Protein backbone atom coordinates (compact mmCIF):
# COMPACT_ATOMS: atom_id res chain seq x y z
CA UNK A 1 0.00 0.00 0.00
CA UNK A 2 1.20 3.49 -0.81
CA UNK A 3 2.03 5.73 2.16
CA UNK A 4 -0.23 8.54 0.91
CA UNK A 5 -3.18 6.09 0.70
CA UNK A 6 -2.46 4.85 4.23
CA UNK A 7 -2.49 8.43 5.54
CA UNK A 8 -5.72 9.20 3.68
CA UNK A 9 -7.59 6.08 4.84
CA UNK A 10 -6.57 6.44 8.50
CA UNK A 11 -6.99 10.24 8.39
CA UNK A 12 -3.58 10.47 10.01
CA UNK A 13 -0.93 13.17 10.06
CA UNK A 14 2.33 12.49 8.23
CA UNK A 15 5.19 14.09 10.13
CA UNK A 16 7.49 14.51 7.13
CA UNK A 17 7.78 13.51 3.49
CA UNK A 18 9.98 10.42 3.36
CA UNK A 19 11.62 9.05 0.23
CA UNK A 20 9.83 5.73 0.85
CA UNK A 21 6.55 5.61 -1.08
CA UNK A 22 4.94 2.34 0.02
CA UNK A 23 4.94 -0.50 2.55
CA UNK A 24 5.03 -4.23 1.86
CA UNK A 25 3.57 -5.72 5.06
CA UNK A 26 2.43 -4.94 8.59
CA UNK A 27 3.27 -6.02 12.13
CA UNK A 28 1.94 -5.21 15.60
CA UNK A 29 5.01 -6.73 17.27
CA UNK A 30 8.32 -4.81 17.04
CA UNK A 31 10.21 -8.09 17.40
CA UNK A 32 8.55 -9.47 14.26
CA UNK A 33 8.95 -6.44 12.01
CA UNK A 34 10.51 -7.20 8.61
CA UNK A 35 12.15 -4.83 6.17
CA UNK A 36 9.46 -2.84 4.37
CA UNK A 37 6.78 -3.28 7.07
CA UNK A 38 4.38 -0.83 8.61
CA UNK A 39 4.69 -1.10 12.39
CA UNK A 40 1.44 -0.36 14.22
CA UNK A 41 2.36 0.71 17.74
CA UNK A 42 -0.48 -0.05 20.18
CA UNK A 43 1.55 0.44 23.36
CA UNK A 44 2.64 3.99 22.45
CA UNK A 45 6.21 3.16 23.44
CA UNK A 46 9.11 5.12 21.98
CA UNK A 47 11.33 2.10 22.63
CA UNK A 48 9.03 -0.12 20.54
CA UNK A 49 9.20 2.41 17.73
CA UNK A 50 13.01 2.43 17.86
CA UNK A 51 13.11 -1.37 17.81
CA UNK A 52 10.79 -1.48 14.79
CA UNK A 53 12.99 1.01 12.92
CA UNK A 54 16.11 -1.02 13.65
CA UNK A 55 14.31 -4.11 12.26
CA UNK A 56 13.63 -2.35 8.96
CA UNK A 57 10.18 -0.74 9.32
CA UNK A 58 9.34 1.70 6.52
CA UNK A 59 6.40 3.33 8.31
CA UNK A 60 5.12 3.78 11.86
CA UNK A 61 1.50 4.27 12.94
CA UNK A 62 0.74 5.48 16.46
CA UNK A 63 -1.61 7.77 18.36
CA UNK A 64 1.24 9.20 20.42
CA UNK A 65 3.32 12.20 19.42
CA UNK A 66 6.76 10.71 18.85
CA UNK A 67 10.32 11.93 18.54
CA UNK A 68 11.20 11.72 14.86
CA UNK A 69 14.61 10.04 14.82
CA UNK A 70 14.78 8.90 11.18
CA UNK A 71 13.81 11.24 8.36
CA UNK A 72 13.52 8.33 5.89
CA UNK A 73 10.68 6.70 7.85
CA UNK A 74 7.00 7.60 7.38
CA UNK A 75 5.84 8.68 10.85
CA UNK A 76 2.02 8.73 10.92
CA UNK A 77 0.05 9.95 13.93
CA UNK A 78 -3.68 9.32 14.38
CA UNK A 79 -6.07 10.58 17.04
CA UNK A 80 -7.58 7.14 17.73
CA UNK A 81 -5.61 4.04 16.72
CA UNK A 82 -8.53 1.60 17.07
CA UNK A 83 -10.67 3.83 14.86
CA UNK A 84 -7.84 3.95 12.32
CA UNK A 85 -7.74 0.13 12.26
CA UNK A 86 -11.51 0.01 11.73
CA UNK A 87 -11.13 2.37 8.76
CA UNK A 88 -8.36 0.20 7.30
CA UNK A 89 -10.48 -2.94 7.70
CA UNK A 90 -13.51 -1.29 6.08
CA UNK A 91 -11.35 -0.15 3.17
CA UNK A 92 -9.96 -3.63 2.48
CA UNK A 93 -13.33 -5.35 2.90
CA UNK A 94 -15.06 -2.91 0.55
CA UNK A 95 -12.36 -2.81 -2.14
CA UNK A 96 -11.92 -6.60 -2.16
CA UNK A 97 -15.69 -7.30 -1.89
CA UNK A 98 -15.16 -9.69 1.02
CA UNK A 99 -18.28 -11.39 2.41
CA UNK A 100 -18.77 -11.18 6.17
CA UNK A 101 -20.90 -13.42 8.40
CA UNK A 102 -22.18 -13.20 11.95
CA UNK A 103 -21.98 -16.64 13.58
CA UNK A 104 -23.41 -17.84 16.89
CA UNK A 105 -21.49 -19.67 19.67
CA UNK A 106 -22.55 -23.13 18.43
CA UNK A 107 -21.43 -22.41 14.88
CA UNK A 108 -18.10 -21.06 16.16
CA UNK A 109 -17.59 -24.28 18.16
CA UNK A 110 -18.14 -26.37 15.04
CA UNK A 111 -15.72 -24.28 12.98
CA UNK A 112 -13.10 -24.63 15.75
CA UNK A 113 -13.49 -28.41 15.76
CA UNK A 114 -13.07 -28.84 12.00
CA UNK A 115 -10.17 -28.45 9.62
CA UNK A 116 -10.81 -25.26 7.70
CA UNK A 117 -10.14 -24.21 4.11
CA UNK A 118 -7.82 -21.31 3.39
CA UNK A 119 -9.32 -17.86 3.15
CA UNK A 120 -11.48 -17.87 6.30
CA UNK A 121 -10.65 -15.12 8.80
CA UNK A 122 -12.20 -15.33 12.27
CA UNK A 123 -12.45 -12.09 14.25
CA UNK A 124 -12.83 -12.12 18.01
CA UNK A 125 -12.10 -8.95 19.99
CA UNK A 126 -9.16 -7.62 18.00
CA UNK A 127 -8.65 -6.62 14.38
CA UNK A 128 -4.89 -7.21 14.53
CA UNK A 129 -4.78 -10.59 12.74
CA UNK A 130 -7.27 -9.45 10.11
CA UNK A 131 -5.22 -6.33 9.33
CA UNK A 132 -2.05 -8.43 9.14
CA UNK A 133 -3.70 -10.87 6.71
CA UNK A 134 -4.80 -7.99 4.46
CA UNK A 135 -1.33 -6.49 4.27
CA UNK A 136 0.71 -9.68 4.24
CA UNK A 137 -0.72 -11.15 1.03
CA UNK A 138 -2.87 -13.77 2.77
CA UNK A 139 -5.99 -13.85 0.63
CA UNK A 140 -9.12 -13.43 2.72
CA UNK A 141 -12.28 -14.75 1.08
CA UNK A 142 -14.67 -14.62 4.02
CA UNK A 143 -14.80 -12.98 7.45
CA UNK A 144 -16.68 -14.66 10.32
CA UNK A 145 -17.27 -13.35 13.82
CA UNK A 146 -19.46 -13.76 16.89
CA UNK A 147 -18.92 -10.07 17.66
CA UNK A 148 -21.81 -8.21 16.05
CA UNK A 149 -20.60 -4.80 17.22
CA UNK A 150 -17.28 -5.28 15.41
CA UNK A 151 -19.00 -6.45 12.22
CA UNK A 152 -21.28 -3.41 12.29
CA UNK A 153 -18.17 -1.22 12.32
CA UNK A 154 -16.11 -2.92 9.61
CA UNK A 155 -18.68 -4.74 7.45
CA UNK A 156 -22.19 -3.32 7.97
CA UNK A 157 -23.59 -5.57 5.22
CA UNK A 158 -22.75 -8.76 7.12
CA UNK A 159 -25.07 -11.78 6.88
CA UNK A 160 -25.95 -14.91 8.82
CA UNK A 161 -24.75 -18.27 7.53
CA UNK A 162 -27.11 -19.55 4.82
CA UNK A 163 -29.74 -22.02 5.96
CA UNK A 164 -29.68 -25.55 4.59
CA UNK A 165 -33.18 -26.65 3.62
CA UNK A 166 -32.22 -30.29 3.14
CA UNK A 167 -33.81 -32.62 5.69
CA UNK A 168 -31.39 -34.24 8.14
CA UNK A 169 -32.20 -37.73 9.45
CA UNK A 170 -30.85 -38.18 12.99
CA UNK A 171 -30.93 -41.69 14.45
CA UNK A 172 -29.11 -41.26 17.74
CA UNK A 173 -30.48 -41.82 21.23
CA UNK A 174 -27.26 -40.74 22.93
CA UNK A 175 -26.79 -37.25 24.36
CA UNK A 176 -23.08 -37.31 23.56
CA UNK A 177 -22.76 -39.02 20.16
CA UNK A 178 -24.59 -38.41 16.90
CA UNK A 179 -25.41 -40.59 13.92
CA UNK A 180 -27.21 -38.95 11.02
CA UNK A 181 -27.58 -38.73 7.26
CA UNK A 182 -26.92 -35.48 5.40
CA UNK A 183 -26.46 -34.77 1.71
CA UNK A 184 -26.31 -38.49 0.95
CA UNK A 185 -23.46 -39.06 3.41
CA UNK A 186 -23.74 -41.06 6.63
CA UNK A 187 -22.06 -39.66 9.74
CA UNK A 188 -21.67 -42.43 12.30
CA UNK A 189 -21.12 -41.94 16.03
CA UNK A 190 -19.60 -38.47 15.80
CA UNK A 191 -18.34 -37.31 19.23
CA UNK A 192 -20.80 -34.42 19.45
CA UNK A 193 -24.24 -34.11 20.97
CA UNK A 194 -27.34 -34.05 18.74
CA UNK A 195 -27.84 -30.62 20.34
CA UNK A 196 -25.16 -29.32 17.96
CA UNK A 197 -26.24 -31.14 14.79
CA UNK A 198 -28.34 -28.31 13.26
CA UNK A 199 -25.33 -26.00 13.62
CA UNK A 200 -22.97 -28.71 12.35
CA UNK A 201 -25.08 -29.18 9.23
CA UNK A 202 -25.26 -25.42 8.68
CA UNK A 203 -21.45 -25.17 8.79
CA UNK A 204 -21.04 -28.18 6.47
CA UNK A 205 -23.47 -26.60 4.01
CA UNK A 206 -21.49 -23.35 4.11
CA UNK A 207 -18.12 -25.06 3.63
CA UNK A 208 -19.35 -26.78 0.47
CA UNK A 209 -18.60 -23.47 -1.27
CA UNK A 210 -14.87 -24.03 -0.71
CA UNK A 211 -12.29 -26.61 -1.69
CA UNK A 212 -12.91 -28.65 1.44
CA UNK A 213 -14.10 -32.09 2.46
CA UNK A 214 -15.01 -33.49 5.86
CA UNK A 215 -12.43 -35.80 7.44
CA UNK A 216 -13.09 -35.75 11.18
CA UNK A 217 -14.18 -33.53 14.03
CA UNK A 218 -12.44 -32.89 17.32
CA UNK A 219 -14.45 -33.24 20.55
CA UNK A 220 -16.19 -29.99 21.37
CA UNK A 221 -15.10 -27.92 24.36
CA UNK A 222 -18.68 -27.35 25.57
CA UNK A 223 -21.51 -29.62 26.76
CA UNK A 224 -18.82 -31.89 28.20
CA UNK A 225 -19.76 -34.93 30.25
CA UNK A 226 -18.17 -36.38 33.37
CA UNK A 227 -19.62 -39.78 34.25
CA UNK A 228 -19.94 -40.46 37.97
CA UNK A 229 -20.96 -43.05 40.55
CA UNK A 230 -23.68 -42.54 43.13
CA UNK A 231 -20.95 -41.32 45.49
CA UNK A 232 -19.62 -38.73 43.04
CA UNK A 233 -16.53 -40.68 41.99
CA UNK A 234 -15.37 -40.13 38.43
CA UNK A 235 -15.73 -42.94 35.90
CA UNK A 236 -14.24 -43.37 32.41
CA UNK A 237 -16.33 -41.71 29.71
CA UNK A 238 -19.52 -43.65 28.99
CA UNK A 239 -18.96 -46.14 31.82
CA UNK A 240 -21.79 -45.06 34.08
CA UNK A 241 -25.49 -44.25 33.99
CA UNK A 242 -25.07 -40.87 35.68
CA UNK A 243 -23.30 -37.84 34.25
CA UNK A 244 -22.51 -34.24 34.98
CA UNK A 245 -22.88 -32.11 31.85
CA UNK A 246 -20.63 -29.08 32.21
CA UNK A 247 -21.10 -25.73 30.48
CA UNK A 248 -19.52 -22.31 31.09
CA UNK A 249 -21.07 -20.27 28.28
CA UNK A 250 -24.22 -18.66 29.65
CA UNK A 251 -25.98 -18.40 26.29
CA UNK A 252 -25.31 -22.07 25.53
CA UNK A 253 -26.26 -23.06 29.08
CA UNK A 254 -29.73 -21.55 28.67
CA UNK A 255 -30.19 -23.32 25.31
CA UNK A 256 -28.98 -26.61 26.78
CA UNK A 257 -31.54 -26.37 29.57
CA UNK A 258 -34.34 -26.26 26.99
CA UNK A 259 -32.76 -29.04 24.94
CA UNK A 260 -32.30 -31.42 27.88
CA UNK A 261 -35.80 -30.75 29.17
CA UNK A 262 -37.10 -31.81 25.76
CA UNK A 263 -35.04 -35.04 25.84
CA UNK A 264 -35.05 -36.15 29.48
CA UNK A 265 -37.77 -36.89 32.01
CA UNK A 266 -37.99 -34.20 34.68
CA UNK A 267 -37.27 -36.72 37.45
CA UNK A 268 -33.93 -37.61 35.81
CA UNK A 269 -32.60 -34.07 35.30
CA UNK A 270 -31.25 -31.45 37.69
CA UNK A 271 -30.02 -27.98 36.69
CA UNK A 272 -27.34 -26.33 38.86
CA UNK A 273 -25.70 -22.91 38.62
CA UNK A 274 -23.95 -20.33 40.83
CA UNK A 275 -26.20 -18.09 42.91
CA UNK A 276 -24.46 -15.07 41.39
CA UNK A 277 -26.13 -15.77 38.02
CA UNK A 278 -29.60 -15.45 39.57
CA UNK A 279 -31.11 -18.10 37.29
CA UNK A 280 -34.24 -20.17 37.88
CA UNK A 281 -32.55 -23.53 38.43
CA UNK A 282 -33.01 -26.53 40.72
CA UNK A 283 -29.84 -25.96 42.74
CA UNK A 284 -27.78 -22.83 43.37
CA UNK A 285 -24.31 -22.89 44.86
CA UNK A 286 -21.85 -20.40 46.32
CA UNK A 287 -18.82 -22.69 46.05
CA UNK A 288 -18.42 -25.36 43.38
CA UNK A 289 -17.60 -27.97 46.06
CA UNK A 290 -21.26 -27.86 47.11
CA UNK A 291 -22.23 -29.99 44.13
CA UNK A 292 -20.84 -33.04 45.92
CA UNK A 293 -23.80 -32.74 48.31
CA UNK A 294 -26.34 -33.12 45.50
CA UNK A 295 -28.79 -35.99 45.47
CA UNK A 296 -27.51 -38.48 42.87
CA UNK A 297 -30.90 -40.01 42.19
CA UNK A 298 -30.83 -37.74 39.16
CA UNK A 299 -29.43 -39.34 36.03
CA UNK A 300 -28.09 -36.10 34.55
CA UNK A 301 -26.98 -32.86 36.17
CA UNK A 302 -26.46 -29.86 33.90
CA UNK A 303 -23.93 -27.72 35.71
CA UNK A 304 -22.78 -24.19 34.95
CA UNK A 305 -19.07 -24.33 35.77
CA UNK A 306 -15.58 -24.39 34.35
CA UNK A 307 -14.74 -27.91 33.21
CA UNK A 308 -11.09 -27.77 34.30
CA UNK A 309 -12.03 -26.41 37.74
CA UNK A 310 -14.47 -29.27 38.17
CA UNK A 311 -11.86 -31.86 37.16
CA UNK A 312 -9.47 -30.40 39.73
CA UNK A 313 -12.12 -30.76 42.43
CA UNK A 314 -12.70 -34.40 41.52
CA UNK A 315 -8.96 -35.09 41.57
CA UNK A 316 -8.66 -33.41 44.97
CA UNK A 317 -11.64 -35.39 46.26
CA UNK A 318 -10.15 -38.68 45.04
CA UNK A 319 -6.76 -37.76 46.51
CA UNK A 320 -8.28 -37.04 49.92
CA UNK A 321 -10.19 -40.33 49.74
CA UNK A 322 -6.94 -42.23 49.14
CA UNK A 323 -5.22 -40.48 52.05
CA UNK A 324 -7.95 -41.55 54.47
CA UNK A 325 -7.28 -45.18 53.56
CA UNK A 326 -3.75 -45.08 55.03
Label every PLM stretch briefly.
Residues 1-86, 226-233, 237, 246-326:
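N-terminal leader/targeting and accessory segments in enzymes
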Residues 43, 186-194:
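A short glycine/serine-rich beta->alpha loop
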Residues 60-68, 106-108, 127, 145-150, ...:
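Short, polar loop motifs at secondary-structure junctions
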Residues 75-77, 100, 119-122, 157-160, ...:
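Conserved beta-strand scaffold positions in the cores of enzyme catalytic domains, especially
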Residues 86-90, 200-208, 258:
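Predominant activation on well-ordered alpha-helical scaffold segments within soluble catalytic domains
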Residues 87-147, 191, 230-232, 239-250, ...:
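Walker A (P-loop) phosphate-binding motif
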Residues 146-187, 224-240, 248, 317:
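Extended acidic/charged loop-beta regions that coordinate divalent cations
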Residues 191-224, 298-306:
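A conserved, hydrophobic alpha-helical segment in the catalytic core
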Amino acid sequence: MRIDNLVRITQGELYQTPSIAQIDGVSFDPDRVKSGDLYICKNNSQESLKKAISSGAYALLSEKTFDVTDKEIAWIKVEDLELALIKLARYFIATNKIDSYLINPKEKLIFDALSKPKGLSFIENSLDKLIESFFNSKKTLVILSENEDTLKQIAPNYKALPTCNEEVFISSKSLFYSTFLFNGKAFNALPISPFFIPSFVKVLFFLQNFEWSFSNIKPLTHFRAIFITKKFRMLPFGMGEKALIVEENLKLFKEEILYLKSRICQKDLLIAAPKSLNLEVDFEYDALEEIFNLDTRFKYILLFANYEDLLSLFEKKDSNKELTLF
